[in-house]
Structures are given as C-alpha cells and as structure tokens.
C-alpha cells in the first residue's frame, strides 16, 4: 500500500514543477473519457446538446456524441462513429474491458465490440422498471491461459435523484442477476478490489444530494459465508464525483466540498479530508495515480491539473491543459487529458491535451522504485529486509487514524522493529532513502 503521508500537503499549491506546454490533439466536442487497449486509444465525446433534451438535432446546430479510436503510436484517429442512440450521461461511467464496451442507456445496456465499434447487443440487460436509470457499470473479468474473459457486470441504478439507489451483480454466463442491494442516493461509480484475505469486494460511490453532505462509499463483500453479503457504509462529504483504488487505499474526489477524502479499505476507516483549493463550480473532477513515479494528478474545472507526490507529500506543481479537464489516462509516457469545456467557460471544447512526462525523471524514478523491501511480522516483531547495504533508511509506522506511532532510521540490509505494546490492528510502514521508497500494510495480531 502506498504512503498516506502525501495527504497532508498535496494540495497546498506553490508550484515547484515548471508548467508544461501541452500538445493539443483535435477530437469530438466535449471529450469525457479515455480508455487505452493495446495500441489503440478510445475517446468518448458527448457532443453539444444545446437544448439538453438528449436528442441529436443537426439542423439546430447541435454536435453528436462520438466515439473515436486513435493509433497509440501516432496519436492519429483511425476510426470514428456517431453514437446513433443519443448522448451520454454525465458522469460518464460505462463498463470497459479489453474487448467490449458496455454502455448504459436509461434502463438498458448496449454492448459494442471495442475494436470494430460494432453494436453487438442493443439490450443485453433491461431493468423491469421503466423509470430506472443505469448510472455506472464495472466489468468483472477473469484470466484463463492469458486470455481475458468478461464474466459479470456490476451496475448501479436509480429511479430518482433523492431516493436510495441499487447495486446489481449480473452474470454474463447465466444471464441472471446474482445480487441486488440497496445503496445510497445517486450511485454513480463502481470499482472492485481484493481485500487482505484475497476476497473480491465491490466499492460503490454514491454522490448524494448537492449540498447535502450525504455522499458515501458503500463497500460490499459477497464472501461473508452467511449467504447475506456484508456491507459497510463510509460517510464522505458533499457530492462525490470520482474515486480510484490503489492497493487498500481509496481516494475519493468530492466535487461539492472541494476535497479529496482518503479511505483505508483494509480497516474500513475514513481518513482526514484534504482541501483541493478550488471553489464554486470549479471543483475537482477526477484523480489518477502514476504508481511508478509516485505522482497524483487531479483534474479540476479551474482549468488546471494539480500534481503532488504520492510518497512524501512534496508539492510538485500545476499543469494547464487549455480547457476544463475531465477524464485522464497515462499512455506511452504521456498524460492524456480530456478538455470537456473551454478554459474559464462552459462551452464544449474539442481537444485532448497531451503532456509528455519527463523521460529522464520517468526512467530514473522507476529504476529506484524497483528496489523493493520485504516486510514480515512474527510474534510482534516486524522484520524489514532491503536490498540496500550501508545506506540510511528512514522508517515511519502509522496507524489507521493517520497517527505516527513509531519512526526512526536504520542502516543495513535487515532491521527488526518491535510492535509489542501497540494495540492489535493494521499499520502502514513507510520506508524512504535516496534509492528506496515503499509502503506496506501489516497486521499486528495475537
């Protein structure tokens, strides 16, 4: 698990990384999301629905929703189609696998071939309630002999903006619903992860009502052994918009309260929130982590990308994509950014900003991070083994509340750290040296 220490200072922005000038690539109107598969890049654009009726009307000057495919080696578009069945929902939360696009359409799901853009099924699943609206899809896949197979869909849906929604697990094998559970108001994003026991858990971000401070992350474990799934509700803040999971840490983007709220998924604990520094309607949109370079990137409607270190809290800087950014992706040593709207305005933009990551730094940081440390616990003694010898290594032990309970420095390949006298529970051990930076989750128990 990566260090939580960056959360204390990442958004106190006084830029130390010089701003980069992006390369702008033309695309459709209002690009929302980017998805890379092998040597192709998929960009989903929502056009311009001038009267907001969901119907494309070219005679009124409207622009259609479109799906572009780019060559990842040349950054040139090779395919593009108009989405004939109308505009996308915002937030845009389709299900994407290595071969398929599962697109929510009110109470139905459309299925497309990802390489040919062919519509394979116009109604894979149809909810019985016509008022239901599918708001988010996540694809559960398995690997067999090196081949990825889509086995299930986790989908969220709602019937109103003020009542609780539902999460549903749908089998692509049996074409049956395996689980349905009530969650919070306006569920809109789903992710899966493996807990410390190796069990799959589903995390559902519920937006809540704007200004209501009732956004929540619902975590569901279907392997409880009781026949009834366990569900944990983690209260967040105002208007959750996006989240990522890195190891056992979820980082949730709160658009209404202008915060990033971290959640320790191992202990189901909400950690202290951090102000992003935006205000009004210019709040944070999405978050992405470069785990190799230990950097966090946050898109904001203040027309910038905010960057911080994921390891030690160092503020790195801001980049300006020349638009209001939405979705982001790392592709071939570049950060791709969707400019959904014009900078400082809400007129749909039609560009993607490419920021080339500094290659020398990029390679150097990855080489350093390949030096791993082995950490094990035995009878209350934590044994730390590194590949370094004769160099000082700083260590910090943090509990689930973010409190540092032990810290120090050792020199050599092995160090023994006593947990005796500390309460049983989960701790994060962070190591830092000139050549090593890593964090590990450990459990101290009887």
Each predicted region: which residue ranges?
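Short, conserved, GDST-rich strand-edge loop motifs in beta-rich repeat architectures
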Residues: 45-64, 149, 155-162, 205-214, ...
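Residue-level detector of functionally pivotal "anchor" positions at catalytic/ligand-binding pockets or at interdomain
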Residues: 355-381
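C-terminal tail/sorting-segment detector
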Residues: 382-383, 424-446
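Short, surface-exposed loop/turn motifs with a glycine/proline- and acidic-biased composition
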Residues: 198, 403-435
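A short beta-strand motif characteristic of beta-propeller blades
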Residues: 20-26, 76-84, 118-129, 176-182, ...
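Short coil/turn segments that connect the beta-strands within blades of beta-propeller domains
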Residues: 38-39, 98-99, 148-150, 198-200, ...
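Repeated scaffold domains used in trafficking and secretory/extracellular systems
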Residues: 29-35, 85-96, 130-143, 185-194, ...
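Blade-level signature of beta-propeller repeat domains, shared across WD40, Kelch, NHL, RCC1
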Residues: 323-360
């Amino acid at each position: 698990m990566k260090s939580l220490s960056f959360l204390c200072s990442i958004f106190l922005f006084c830029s130390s990384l010089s701003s980069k000038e992006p390369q702008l690539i033309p695309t459709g109107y209002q690009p929302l999301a980017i998805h890379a598969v092998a040597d192709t890049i998929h960009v989903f654009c929502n056009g311009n629905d001038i009267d907001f009726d969901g119907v494309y009307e070219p005679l009124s000057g409207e622009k259609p929703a479109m799906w572009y495919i780019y060559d990842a080696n040349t950054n040139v578009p090779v395919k593009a189609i108009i989405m004939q069945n109308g505009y996308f929902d915002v937030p845009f939360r389709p299900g994407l696998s290595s071969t398929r696009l599962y697109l929510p359409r009110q109470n139905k799901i459309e299925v497309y071939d990802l390489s040919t853009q062919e519509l394979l099924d116009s109604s894979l699943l149809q909810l019985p309630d016509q008022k239901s609206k599918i708001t988010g899809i996540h694809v559960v896949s398995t690997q067999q002999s090196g081949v990825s197979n889509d086995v299930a869909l986790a989908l969220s849906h709602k019937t109103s903006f003020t009542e609780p929604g539902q999460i549903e697990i749908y089998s692509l094998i049996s074409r049956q619903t395996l689980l349905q559970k009530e969650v919070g108001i306006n569920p809109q994003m789903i992710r899966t992860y493996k807990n410390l026991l190796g069990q799959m858990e589903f995390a559902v971000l519920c937006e809540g009502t704007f200004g209501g401070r009732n956004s929540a992350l619902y975590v569901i474990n279907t392997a409880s052994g009781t026949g009834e799934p366990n569900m944990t509700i983690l209260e967040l803040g105002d208007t959750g918009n996006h989240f990522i999971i890195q190891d056992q840490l979820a980082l949730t983007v709160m658009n209404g309260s202008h915060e990033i709220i971290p959640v320790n998924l191992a202990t189901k604990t909400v950690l202290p929130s951090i102000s992003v520094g935006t205000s009004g309607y210019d709040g944070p949109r999405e978050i992405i982590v470069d785990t190799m370079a230990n950097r966090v990137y946050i898109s904001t409607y203040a027309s910038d990308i905010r960057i911080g270190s994921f390891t030690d809290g160092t503020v790195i800087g801001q980049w300006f994509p020349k638009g209001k950014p939405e979705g982001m992706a790392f592709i071939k040593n570049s950060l791709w950014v969707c400019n959904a709207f014009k900078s400082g305005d809400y007129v749909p933009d039609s560009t993607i900003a490419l920021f080339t990551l500094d290659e020398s730094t990029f390679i150097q940081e990855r080489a350093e991070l390949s030096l791993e440390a082995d950490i094990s616990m035995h009878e209350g003694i934590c044994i730390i083994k590194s590949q370094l010898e004769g160099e000082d290594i700083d260590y910090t032990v943090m509990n689930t509340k973010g409190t540092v309970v032990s810290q120090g420095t050792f020199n050599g390949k092995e160090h023994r750290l006593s947990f005796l006298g500390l309460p049983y529970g989960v701790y994060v051990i962070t190591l830092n040296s000139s050549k090593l930076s890593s964090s590990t989750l450990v459990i101290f128990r009887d």
